[in-house]
Each structure stands twice: as C-alpha cells, then as structure tokens.
C-alpha cells in the first residue's frame, strides 16, 4: 500500500517528465550549454525521485526519517541545478566560476547538514 498516493504518483510522474524535458532542452540548445542543462534536468529528476520514494513507501519510522532527509537533500541539489544554466550562460570567466562554486558549495553543505541532522 502507498503511504501518500497523490504525492507519490505526482512526484513519480515528475521523474520521466523531468528527464524528457531535459532531453528536449538538450536538443534545442547548443552543445556548450549541455553540461549546465544536464545538471538542471538530472537534479530535477533526482528531486522528484527522492520525493516519490519518501511519499510512496510505508516503512518503519527510522527508514522514513532517512528518506525524508534524502528528499530534503535532493531539494538542495535541485536549487543548485536550477541556478546552473543561468550562471553558466549569463556570466563569464572568474565570475562564472565563483558563482557556480558558491552555489554548488552551499548546496553540498546543505546536503551534508540535512543527511547528518
């Protein structure tokens, strides 16, 4: 039995839709934009996948708490993934490198914090 049917279904549907949308973006974009668009599409799919797992599984409290932390950690990654195309295409040189390092560094700190606490 599914723990939260609507959330589970809507978030599970988000995974293939995110992958399909990401693929369409790749087909429409120049090759130099592909790494940033891959970060966007894959982190979106990861976020929906982690959320679908959390909302689907009926499990003991300890496992649910871990899945909830994974769900929240994936949100940090998607925030960085959604900034990436804008920063990669909108900035140049050192500004781009600094902004990407800052956004991804903060996201990884958030992931680490959320997985540990």
Each language-model region and where it sits:
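Multi-pass alpha-helical transmembrane bundles in non-GPCR membrane proteins
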Residues: 1-117
